[in-house]
Amino acid sequence: MQQETQAPPLLLLYARSISKTNYIFRVSAMDENYENFTDAYEEMWGFDANETNTFASSEVRVISLVVYCLTFLLGVPGNSFVIFIAGMKMKRTVNTIWFLNLATADLLCCLSVPLTVAEILLDHHWPYGYAMCKILPSVIVISMFASVFTLNIISLDRFTQVITPVWAQNHRSLLLARLSCVAVWILALLLSLPFMILRRTYEEFNMTVCTFDDDDFTTYGALSIVRFVFGFLIPLMSIVTCYGIIARKLGSRHFRSGRAFRIMLAVIVAFFLCWMPYHVLDLIRSYGGESSSMVALKVDPLAISLAYVNSCLNPVLYVFMGQDFKNKVQLSLRRVFERAFSEEGTQISRSTQSQQVHSVL
């Protein structure tokens, strides 16, 4: 196994300031090397080192930790229950495969939260070793890609049902859905691989940190663009285009009438709202000016925790949007999820345009 190597203090500082898992920068935790460290920092970057104490105040630290804990407490049981219902208790349909894939990606992200919280509480000392430095910080990136690609496929699935219903009726199968999910995970792993390769452990200031291995972070900046384009921009444009064409084809009233549509729209909106600050701040820190980069560093912990929140939201949305809330108190959770994931098209006649619209959406 590769041994830990020494890193220049300036590289370590900047790496820690942009690292997605080592984001809470605390100069006060440094040892006797602090004076030399701050001198080099000010000479290199032109910032007042004392100002960096505000990069992550105690309030931001506490809020982030609370958000992480809530994400874990809601996300693990919620997504586990979705997987149990969709994977074992319901008849297997294309819709249940989509929701099962989303829940798997979200659960993977939620399960990594305790390790991330422990590292934050240890003032970013990395106790998990070199191999986990490659794997653990990449979990959220893999989850992000898998989730957004699944949402994109769901949009294309809805699109084909409306625009090419004959093709969808003949080719929309469980096998194709499963193969699509496999392709989603392969693509997510491939796009996350560069982030895994660049990460390594460094021994500095009497502590071990896990961060990126790149002298000037040019490669990291390029990867930030790749992550934004393939993990946010292209999927967003594709999803908006698909649903825009569907709405134009069917009319806004019919477009909004389906239960499954309302649920999926809420899931899509929640994803992009939770992840947008993450991507925007990442680009600002990589390519923004001095003042904008410092502002981005100050609020970055909240953006990261908000991205994690998305992994616990979907089960909540399934429950509160699957049907009228006043009726939910009379149903078991299992029945609620079954209705949320149901294939409405198998229950409604297609004899009229209105009925066909409802079956698709």
Curated annotation (Swiss-Prot):
PROSITE patterns, sorted: G_PROTEIN_RECEP_F1_1 (PS00237), G_PROTEIN_RECEP_F1_2 (PS50262)
Domain of life: Eukaryota
GO CC annotation, single: plasma membrane
Transmembrane segments: 65-85, 97-117, 135-155, 178-198, 225-245, 263-283, 302-322
UniProt topological domain (Extracellular) ranges: 1-64, 118-134, 199-224, 284-301
InterPro entries given in the database record: Formyl_rcpt-rel, GPCR_Rhodpsn, GPCR_Rhodpsn_7TM
GO biological process: one example: inflammatory response
Carbohydrate attachment residues: 36, 50
Keywords attached to this entry: Cell membrane, Chemotaxis, Disulfide bond, G-protein coupled receptor, Glycoprotein, Membrane, Receptor, Transducer, Transmembrane, Transmembrane helix
Annotated source species: Danio rerio (Zebrafish)
Pfam families in UniProt: 7tm_1 (PF00001)
PANTHER family: C5A ANAPHYLATOXIN CHEMOTACTIC RECEPTOR 1 (PTHR24225:SF29), CHEMOTACTIC RECEPTOR (PTHR24225)
Name of this protein: C3a anaphylatoxin chemotactic receptor
Gene Ontology molecular-function annotations: complement component C5a receptor activity; G protein-coupled receptor activity
Role noted for this protein: Receptor for the chemotactic and inflammatory peptide anaphylatoxin C3a. This receptor stimulates chemotaxis, granule enzyme release and superoxide anion production.
Disulfide bridge map: 133-210
Membrane topology: Multi-pass membrane protein
Family: Belongs to the G-protein coupled receptor 1 family.
Localization in the cell: Cell membrane
Name of encoding gene: c3ar1
Cytoplasmic side: 86-96, 156-177, 246-262, 323-361
